[in-house]
């Protein structure tokens, strides 16, 4: 799905710094070396042994992933080659974010990477395009080792088409020198504070559908029905959706609210001390922690009060990072083996330690002490119970633009309480419109 600003950030999914394939590539040959490869655009060959001991069968694989994961991917690929010395593996790396994977792969499936990372909302689109190779190697093991929700997100009609490895949603970072644990329990508590040096008490990307949906979910609204698979249902324009609209209009009008904070504004606000709390994800954990130092804190999203007096917990949209194998790869068994390696327990732990990515591996995720030792991942875990898994049905393509337009109209002041119902009706009508 989206991540409109985030995944083109995470998740965020992240996700910032997105580049397209072609901007950077790197080739490495390896039969056991842990050489991470050369600079972009160059090729290096490393043999790990003499020709007489090198694998006799040569296998070339192209791997795509986001810019921020390139060094990790290269390290993991070289370790895969070292663990499989019976073959000589060469790797070509391309920079493609999870958010852009579907777009780039579907330009020309035959020219796309053998193995690539994608966001779980793209599963159905990629399968329908014939772009994903069905997992036939070690399927039962992969299913058993990863969370049920992540496996469901990587499956279509009971068939597994990918290897989940990161669980993702958003939560709230805050500066604990400016806000207390009690303050951050509710938006009202945050916004009621007068804080020296702070111009923005609470920041949120209002015109970003991935975030915006959290308010509607918190009020009990549903996007594409109870399980997210009915393309004829969206009730954001019902009575409870109307109360969400009212709340957003009032919130955006508050001068202490940052209504259109993308990743760069969130990070700069914490860095210069003008921001007290913001909604974001694990992809920004490192920079925010560096800025806040001992005052670094994170928690689940806050509660908010509807116009009928009811207090509700803000929801969120969750998805997963998945590694897929190209349906047209010339080396399906090797590509599946590599995808499984890149997403195994050890490498999920590596990502957790290096990037603060929350694992889908059941054993790792159930290690509460370890997960909570990372403040951002601990906050993500708190919010997960209030999250709605991002659907991968094709109709979801219709969600992002009207969500953005609705948010922009609230920010611009053209969506008011007097025309709110009409704006919500138009929003839902656009979401449910027949796909072109």
Predicted regions and their residues:
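A structural signal for short loop-to-beta-strand junctions that line the ligand-binding cleft
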Residues: 106-107, 111-114, 142-176, 200-205, ...
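Extracytoplasmic/periplasmic solute-binding protein
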Residues: 161-165, 170, 188-234, 275
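Hinge/lid segment of periplasmic solute-binding proteins
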Residues: 42, 120-171, 182, 297-301, ...
């Amino acid at each position: 799905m989206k991540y409109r600003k985030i995944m083109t950030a995470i998740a965020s999914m992240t996700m910032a710094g997105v580049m397209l394939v072609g901007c950077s590539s790197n080739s490495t040959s390896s039969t056991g070396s842990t050489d991470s490869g050369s600079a972009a655009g160059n090729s290096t060959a490393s043999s790990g042994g003499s020709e007489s001991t090198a694998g006799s069968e040569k296998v070339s694989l192209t791997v795509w992933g986001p810019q921020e994961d390139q060094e990790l991917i290269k390290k993991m690929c070289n370790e895969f080659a070292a663990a499989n010395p019976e073959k000589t593996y060469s790797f070509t790396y391309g920079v493609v974010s999870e958010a852009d994977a579907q777009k780039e792969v579907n330009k020309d499936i035959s020219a796309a990477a053998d193995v690539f990372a994608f966001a779980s909302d793209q599963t159905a689109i990629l399968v329908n395009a014939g772009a994903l190779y069905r997992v036939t190697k070690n399927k039962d093991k992969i299913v058993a080792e990863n969370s049920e929700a992540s496996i469901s997100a990587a499956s279509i009609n009971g068939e597994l088409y990918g290897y989940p490895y990161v669980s993702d949603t958003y939560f709230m970072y805050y500066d604990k020198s400016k806000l207390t644990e009690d303050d951050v329990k509710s938006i009202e508590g945050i916004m009621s504070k007068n804080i020296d040096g702070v111009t923005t008490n609470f920041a949120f990307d209002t015109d970003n559908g991935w975030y915006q949906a959290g308010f509607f979910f918190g009020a009990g609204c549903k996007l594409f029905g109870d399980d997210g698979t009915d393309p004829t249902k969206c009730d954001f324009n019902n009575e409870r959706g109307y109360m969400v609209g009212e709340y957003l209009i009032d919130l955006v009008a508050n001068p202490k609210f940052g209504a259109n904070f993308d990743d760069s504004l969130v990070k700069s606000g914490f860095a210069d001390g003008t921001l007290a709390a913001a909604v974001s994800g694990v992809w920004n954990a490192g920079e925010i922690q560096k800025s806040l130092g001992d005052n670094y804190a994170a928690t689940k999203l806050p509660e908010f009060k509807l116009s009928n007096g009811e207090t509700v917990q803000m929801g969120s949209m969750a998805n997963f990072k998945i590694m897929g194998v190209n349906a047209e790869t010339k080396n399906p068994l090797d590509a599946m083996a590599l995808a499984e390696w890149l997403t195994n327990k050890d490498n999920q732990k590596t990502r957790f330690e290096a990037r603060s990515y929350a694992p889908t591996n059941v054993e790792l995720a159930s290690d509460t002490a370890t997960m909570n030792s990372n403040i951002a991942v601990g906050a993500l875990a708190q919010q997960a119970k209030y999250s709605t898994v991002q659907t991968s049905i094709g109709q979801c393509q219709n969600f992002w633009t009207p969500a953005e337009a609705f948010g922009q109209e609230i920010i611009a002041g053209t969506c008011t309480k007097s025309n709110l119902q009409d704006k919500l009706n138009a929003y839902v009508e656009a979401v449910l419109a027949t796909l072109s």
